[in-house]
Amino acid sequence: MAAYAAFKHVELYNVGKAKKRVLRPPGGGSSDIFGADMPATPRTVKNRMISNIFSADKDGAIKNNVRQGAHRFYFIGETPRRGQKSVDSHSRLFGEPSRPITPGKNHMKSSIPFGQNSEAAAAQKLLTNGNTNSTTNGHYNGKSGSVSSASSSVSSSTENLKINSGSRSVFRNMSTAAGADKMNKMDDPDCASLISQGNSGFADPVAQGGDTASIDMPCKSNDVGSLHGDNQSHTESGRYGYSSQSRRTAGTSPLNPYSLDKINSASAAFKEPLGPCSDYIKDPQHVPCIKIHAKDEHRNPITGLGLNGDGVGGLKPKKMKIREGNPVTGEGYKSGGSDSAQTPTMNGANQVINKNRVPPGGYSSGLW
């Protein structure tokens, strides 16, 4: 009886005649698809593509938080019920938040200065002819108030242009003091004449009354003379430059390369055989070389050694490739030594096997 009572308590009130649940249509009982009137507070659609960075949402849209069943008796957090305003704890305790207004920068506007305006002239005067606390060597070293107040109205590119020009003038003054002695000892005496004649294409700082430095003096470059006459011939090309040679005088010394005119000679100073050796050795100090037959007179021009006679740098012997039989059909292969002439048996019974059949996948499939 107790089990029936428990079953009745669970199921009969839901399914039986004691109690029936009323199902709600989709969208609620007040949905417009069933002909009901629209509610007094219609559902608002939020535009999620709009930015709300600079706008304080004081009276925001009331969200439609309709819960079904037992969930309609409570709400989570600060989400209000339907028809109520949102509760903002921060605005209730500290007031409305004030967001700083950040002005947008126009990145499409050009910052290249064209001409000298009044603001740029004031900045130039401040950077160059101002008091000592404003600028020193093209950098701000004084108080930030005096410099920033005058330079705030000038664009950043104009400011950098004036600073760079000031640094260049300071470097020119330093170079003038350090290089005064070098100007009197210049190797090219035509520098002053080129500047005075105007052939250099640069403005004359001396004629303009400005400072003169070594970096402001355009000098002509001396032309490199022609090569030595003996270098025109390939037989004498190694006389004036050892670095361009590639041969050696001895087999153990990488130094002292000799000239190209001695390659075909048979001097005793060379310990490497440069050509086919004779039958006997005239000089006992000379290292004996290997006799090369007439059929093997093919030399390596780099090492001077034969290709086939001495085995150094020789040709590899050709390996004979056995090309017998068809790897797909199996025709033409020779029988191996392990093959027996007996008739193979399967399961103890004598059966004739067709030896000419092709295995699955062919002989070259790797399974056989």
Curated annotation (Swiss-Prot):
The protein's name in its UniProt record:
Microtubule-associated protein Jupiter
Q: Which family does it belong to?
A: Belongs to the MAP Jupiter family.
What PANTHER family does this protein's entry cite? GEO05313P1 (PTHR34930), MICROTUBULE-ASSOCIATED PROTEIN JUPITER (PTHR34930:SF2)
Residue ranges annotated as compositionally biased, kind Basic and acidic residues, are 81-93
- Composition skew (Polar residues), residue ranges: 337-354
Give the matching InterPro entries.
JUPITER (IPR033335)
Region (Disordered) residue ranges read 81-106, 129-164, 196-256, 316-368
Q: Which GO terms describe its biological process?
A: positive regulation of microtubule polymerization
- Superkingdom field: Eukaryota
* Composition skew (Low complexity), residue ranges: 129-157, 238-248
* Gene name in the database record: Jupiter
Give the function comment from the record. Binds to all microtubule populations.
Gene Ontology CC, one term: spindle
Q: Would the keyword Amino-acid biosynthesis be found if you checked this record's keyword annotation?
A: no
Q: Where in the cell is it found?
A: Nucleus; Cytoplasm; Cytoplasm, Cytoskeleton; Cytoplasm, Cytoskeleton, Spindle
An example molecular function term from Gene Ontology annotations = structural constituent of cytoskeleton
Q: Has UniProt tagged this entry with the keyword Cytoplasm?
A: yes
Subcellular location, principal: nucleus
Q: PTM Phosphothreonine: list the residues.
A: T41, T102
Q: Which UniProt keywords apply?
A: Cytoplasm, Cytoskeleton, Microtubule, Nucleus, Phosphoprotein
Modified sites of kind Phosphoserine: S30, S111, S146, S157
